[in-house]
Amino acid sequence: KNHPAAIYADKRVEEMYGVWKSGNGQSERSCVIAPDVQCDFTDLPFDDNSFALVVWDPPHLRHIGENAWLAKKYGRLDNNWPKMLHDGFKECMRVLKPDGVLIFKWAETQIPATEVWKAIGQRPLFGHHSGKKSQTFWGCFMKWKDTNDDAE
Protein backbone atom coordinates (compact mmCIF):
# COMPACT_ATOMS: atom_id res chain seq x y z
CA LYS A 1 0.00 0.00 0.00
CA ASN A 2 3.00 2.29 0.26
CA HIS A 3 4.35 1.63 -3.25
CA PRO A 4 4.20 4.75 -5.48
CA ALA A 5 2.26 2.85 -8.17
CA ALA A 6 -0.38 1.64 -5.68
CA ILE A 7 -3.65 3.30 -4.70
CA TYR A 8 -4.68 2.25 -1.20
CA ALA A 9 -8.45 2.44 -0.63
CA ASP A 10 -10.32 1.90 2.65
CA LYS A 11 -13.56 3.25 4.08
CA ARG A 12 -11.84 3.96 7.41
CA VAL A 13 -9.41 6.69 8.37
CA GLU A 14 -8.11 6.08 11.90
CA GLU A 15 -5.11 6.12 14.19
CA MET A 16 -5.29 3.65 17.06
CA TYR A 17 -2.94 3.03 19.94
CA GLY A 18 -3.15 0.47 22.71
CA VAL A 19 -1.23 -1.29 25.46
CA TRP A 20 -1.46 -4.99 26.16
CA LYS A 21 0.27 -7.46 28.42
CA SER A 22 2.90 -9.60 26.77
CA GLY A 23 5.48 -12.09 28.05
CA ASN A 24 7.76 -9.18 29.01
CA GLY A 25 5.16 -7.06 30.77
CA GLN A 26 3.44 -4.41 28.69
CA SER A 27 3.89 -3.63 25.04
CA GLU A 28 2.42 -0.93 22.86
CA ARG A 29 0.75 -1.40 19.54
CA SER A 30 -0.46 1.07 17.00
CA CYS A 31 -2.36 1.00 13.75
CA VAL A 32 -2.66 3.85 11.29
CA ILE A 33 -5.29 3.51 8.57
CA ALA A 34 -4.58 6.30 6.09
CA PRO A 35 -5.89 5.39 2.64
CA ASP A 36 -5.11 7.36 -0.51
CA VAL A 37 -8.83 7.13 -1.35
CA GLN A 38 -11.53 6.79 1.29
CA CYS A 39 -14.35 4.64 -0.10
CA ASP A 40 -16.36 1.47 0.38
CA PHE A 41 -15.19 -1.49 -1.71
CA THR A 42 -18.78 -2.15 -2.78
CA ASP A 43 -18.88 1.25 -4.54
CA LEU A 44 -15.42 2.11 -5.87
CA PRO A 45 -14.93 5.65 -7.24
CA PHE A 46 -12.97 4.50 -10.30
CA ASP A 47 -13.93 4.18 -13.95
CA ASP A 48 -14.58 0.79 -15.54
CA ASN A 49 -11.44 -0.96 -16.80
CA SER A 50 -9.05 1.29 -14.83
CA PHE A 51 -6.51 -1.17 -13.41
CA ALA A 52 -4.46 -4.11 -14.65
CA LEU A 53 -4.05 -5.41 -11.08
CA VAL A 54 -6.28 -5.21 -8.00
CA VAL A 55 -5.36 -6.65 -4.59
CA TRP A 56 -8.42 -7.12 -2.38
CA ASP A 57 -8.15 -7.87 1.34
CA PRO A 58 -11.66 -7.49 2.77
CA PRO A 59 -12.53 -7.95 6.45
CA HIS A 60 -12.84 -11.62 7.35
CA LEU A 61 -14.01 -11.63 10.99
CA ARG A 62 -17.70 -11.95 11.94
CA HIS A 63 -17.64 -13.14 15.52
CA ILE A 64 -15.65 -10.42 17.23
CA GLY A 65 -16.52 -7.48 19.45
CA GLU A 66 -16.88 -4.10 17.80
CA ASN A 67 -14.11 -2.63 19.97
CA ALA A 68 -11.72 -5.60 19.78
CA TRP A 69 -8.23 -4.76 18.54
CA LEU A 70 -8.50 -7.10 15.52
CA ALA A 71 -11.87 -5.58 14.56
CA LYS A 72 -10.39 -2.09 14.75
CA LYS A 73 -7.30 -3.08 12.77
CA TYR A 74 -8.89 -5.26 10.07
CA GLY A 75 -12.60 -4.37 10.11
CA ARG A 76 -15.44 -6.79 10.67
CA LEU A 77 -18.22 -8.42 8.69
CA ASP A 78 -21.89 -8.12 9.53
CA ASN A 79 -24.63 -10.69 8.97
CA ASN A 80 -24.97 -9.54 5.36
CA TRP A 81 -21.39 -10.58 4.57
CA PRO A 82 -22.22 -12.79 1.53
CA LYS A 83 -23.85 -9.85 -0.31
CA MET A 84 -21.10 -7.48 0.79
CA LEU A 85 -18.37 -9.78 -0.56
CA HIS A 86 -20.37 -10.49 -3.73
CA ASP A 87 -20.79 -6.76 -4.40
CA GLY A 88 -17.14 -6.06 -3.55
CA PHE A 89 -15.96 -8.77 -5.93
CA LYS A 90 -18.20 -7.39 -8.68
CA GLU A 91 -16.71 -3.92 -8.14
CA CYS A 92 -13.15 -5.25 -8.27
CA MET A 93 -13.95 -6.95 -11.57
CA ARG A 94 -15.60 -3.80 -12.91
CA VAL A 95 -12.51 -1.66 -12.36
CA LEU A 96 -10.16 -4.31 -13.77
CA LYS A 97 -9.05 -3.98 -17.38
CA PRO A 98 -9.77 -6.93 -19.67
CA ASP A 99 -7.22 -9.65 -18.88
CA GLY A 100 -6.60 -7.89 -15.55
CA VAL A 101 -5.73 -9.87 -12.42
CA LEU A 102 -7.40 -9.78 -9.02
CA ILE A 103 -5.38 -11.07 -6.07
CA PHE A 104 -7.74 -11.93 -3.23
CA LYS A 105 -6.61 -12.46 0.37
CA TRP A 106 -8.85 -14.33 2.76
CA ALA A 107 -8.25 -15.58 6.32
CA GLU A 108 -10.26 -18.75 6.99
CA THR A 109 -10.31 -18.31 10.77
CA GLN A 110 -14.12 -18.01 10.88
CA ILE A 111 -15.50 -18.42 7.34
CA PRO A 112 -14.10 -21.08 4.99
CA ALA A 113 -13.01 -19.88 1.55
CA THR A 114 -15.52 -22.28 -0.03
CA GLU A 115 -18.33 -20.18 1.52
CA VAL A 116 -16.76 -17.04 0.05
CA TRP A 117 -16.59 -18.61 -3.44
CA LYS A 118 -20.32 -19.42 -3.14
CA ALA A 119 -21.06 -15.83 -2.15
CA ILE A 120 -19.10 -14.25 -4.99
CA GLY A 121 -20.14 -16.83 -7.57
CA GLN A 122 -16.64 -17.83 -8.72
CA ARG A 123 -13.66 -19.88 -7.66
CA PRO A 124 -10.11 -18.60 -8.13
CA LEU A 125 -7.98 -19.84 -11.01
CA PHE A 126 -5.47 -20.98 -8.41
CA GLY A 127 -4.41 -20.11 -4.90
CA HIS A 128 -2.07 -20.74 -2.01
CA HIS A 129 -2.45 -21.16 1.75
CA SER A 130 0.03 -19.38 4.01
CA GLY A 131 0.43 -18.25 7.61
CA LYS A 132 1.25 -20.02 10.86
CA LYS A 133 -1.78 -22.32 10.65
CA SER A 134 -2.20 -22.12 6.85
CA GLN A 135 -5.48 -20.25 7.38
CA THR A 136 -4.69 -17.37 5.02
CA PHE A 137 -5.66 -18.03 1.42
CA TRP A 138 -4.33 -16.04 -1.52
CA GLY A 139 -6.47 -16.54 -4.63
CA CYS A 140 -5.95 -15.34 -8.18
CA PHE A 141 -8.85 -14.33 -10.43
CA MET A 142 -8.74 -12.92 -13.95
CA LYS A 143 -11.12 -10.70 -15.87
CA TRP A 144 -11.57 -12.33 -19.24
CA LYS A 145 -11.76 -10.13 -22.31
CA ASP A 146 -15.43 -10.93 -22.90
CA THR A 147 -16.91 -10.66 -19.38
CA ASN A 148 -17.15 -12.02 -15.86
CA ASP A 149 -20.93 -11.73 -15.69
CA ASP A 150 -21.24 -15.10 -13.94
CA ALA A 151 -20.33 -13.22 -10.75
CA GLU A 152 -23.80 -11.61 -10.77
Regions found by a protein language model. Give the residues of each.
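Class I S-adenosyl-L-methionine-dependent methyltransferase catalytic core
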Residues: K1-E152
